[in-house]
């Protein structure tokens, strides 16, 4: 019974980590730029990046870029 409970706890923790990894978290860099990990579908998703910067982070700027899946604005 303890073994089954331990497995349940581990699965619950993994599930929580996976959900939080898919949330868009706005982070400000030391240079004042905003970054959003996993904010771009690909390196060309600048419009999606711009939308996230404005709606999710409440951050407006004239330039947005995607490097891999990371959004910079």
Curated annotation (Swiss-Prot):
- Name the keywords, alphabetized: Ion channel impairing toxin, Potassium channel impairing toxin, Secreted, Signal, Toxin, Voltage-gated potassium channel impairing toxin
Broad class of where this protein is predominantly found: secreted
Impact noted for substituting residue 63 to K = No significant effects on inhibition of host Kv1.3/KCNA3 activity
Which cellular compartments is it found in? Secreted
Q: Which residue positions does the secretion signal occupy?
A: 1-21
Q: Which purpose does this protein serve, as stated in its record?
A: Salivary protein that inhibits host voltage-gated potassium channels Kv1.1/KCNA1, Kv1.2/KCNA2 and Kv1.3/KCNA3 likely via a voltage-independent pore-blocking mechanism. Suppresses expression of the Kv1.3/KCNA3 channel in lipopolysaccharide (LPS)-stimulated mouse macrophages and human T-cells. Down-regulates secretion of nitric oxide (NO) and inflammatory cytokines, such as TNF-alpha/TNF, IL-1beta/IL1B and IL6, in LPS-stimulated mouse macrophages in a manner dependent on Kv1.3/KCNA3 channel blockage.
Q: What else is known?
A: Exhibits anti-inflammatory effect in mouse carrageenan-induced paw edema assay. Attenuates delayed-type hypersensitivity reactions in a rat model. Reduces migration and invasion of NCI-H460 cancer cells.
Name this polypeptide is given:
Salivary protein FS48
Organism per entry: Xenopsylla cheopis
Highest classification ranks of the organism: Eukaryota, Metazoa, Ecdysozoa, Arthropoda, Hexapoda
């Amino acid at each position: 019974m303890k073994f089954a409970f331990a497995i349940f706890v581990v699965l619950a923790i993994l599930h929580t980590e996976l959900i939080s990894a898919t949330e868009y978290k706005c982070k400000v860099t030391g240079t004042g730029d905003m970054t959003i990990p996993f904010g771009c579908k690909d390196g060309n998703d600048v419009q999606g990046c711009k939308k996230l910067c404005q709606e999710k982070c409440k951050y407006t700027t004239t330039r947005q870029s995607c490097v891999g899946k990371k959004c910079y604005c």
